[in-house]
Amino acid sequence: MCDEDAAALVVDNGSGMCKAGFAGDDAPRAVFPSIVGRPRHQGVMVGMGNKDSYVGDEAQSKRGILTLKYPIEHGIITNWDDMEKIWHHTFYNELRVAPEEHPVLLTEAPLNPKANREKMTQIMFETFNSPAMYVAIQAVLSLYASGRTTGIVLDSGDGVSHTVPIYEGYALPHAILRLDLAGRDLTDYLMKILTERGYSFTTTAEREIVRDIKEKLCYVALDFEQEMATAAASTSLEKSYELPDGQVITIGNERFRCPEALFQPSFLGMESCGIHETVYNSIMKCDVDIRKDLYANTVLSGGTTMYPGIADRMQKEITALAPSSIKIKIIAPPERKYSVWIGGSILASLSTFQAMWISKQEYDESGPAIVHRKCF
């Protein structure tokens, strides 16, 4: 690894989790929830060092007395004051670096509004005094991490899912499709269907418990109807989960009904296409000559693609949509939860990339709009 003094920082700000670390490392050093919590009640304890806000894991552990807010919604930053708190926490508390000493690579959602990239650039240079920075598109980094430069990435995180076709390293913007259906919606849906079983989860703190149930017990059925029949006929698919207070709850068909919403958004009352159709539609928006390469390089990325069974189901669904002669390959790397970050780590440590950074000097000369000229 290059000397830590000037190692570039790679920060992948997701809607649910923030992943941060040093370029050249093979995994992020810090992974923490993208949340800012504020006390719900007036402090009564003496010597508690009353803070007006908590970030990340600390907010998570004190969630019972806080109101939790996510500054990134659907992949796009909506609350800049809270976002600054998260970046501050990333640099000073998690990585323990002085941001003015390291170039920083940030990631952004595909089709991020132009004003957002400018604001990110401005905050890095003016608030944190970064010597250099760059903004990269998340899905492109995931593809790099899989060792490819051509393919289609289905990137599904906590707040948003995208299908991004990439040819020779360039995202094809006209064919990028966005689906506002991701991990957070599945957590909400699981809360709802658990209520049907008579379990009640309502507060922001309880939602985090349901998220944990989802991550530990849910899976994608290869054949939904058949799985429902199996679940109805026997208890073989039931699992139990112990809540923090010791109460044990049992969950059965909810285990696969929850992620099924990715393939059938009508479960959530949404009219959009499922993830399999979205991938297919995205491919069909591309030039006919490159479609074959996209079908053969379909890469899954992000935490919401971590369900067991998702790759097999994708293979089955896309095979049903595509021409019969075509070879379809779904690539689901085991580290796909972090592949955006890993791709950023690879990119920022390439010798050929060093000329791509936006320097403080360029920013001072051109202002925030420089980001559109240098990052594409």
Curated annotation (Swiss-Prot):
GO terms for cellular component: cytoplasm; cytoskeleton. SMART domains: ACTIN. Keywords: Acetylation, ATP-binding, Cytoplasm, Cytoskeleton, Hydrolase, Nucleotide-binding, Oxidation. It holds the Pfam family Actin. It comes from the Eukaryota. It is found in: Cytoplasm, Cytoskeleton. Signal peptide: none annotated. The modification Methionine sulfoxide is found at residues 45, 48. This is Actin-1. Belongs to the actin family. Actins are highly conserved proteins that are involved in various types of cell motility and are ubiquitously expressed in all eukaryotic cells. It catalyses: ATP + H2O = ADP + phosphate + H(+). Its EC number is 3.6.4.-. Oxidation of Met-45 to form methionine sulfoxide promotes actin filament depolymerization. Methionine sulfoxide is produced stereospecifically, but it is not known whether the (S)-S-oxide or the (R)-S-oxide is produced. Residues 1-2 form a propeptide. The keyword Ligase does not apply. One of its GO terms (molecular function) is ATP binding. The modification N-acetylaspartate is found at residue 3. It comes from Aedes aegypti.
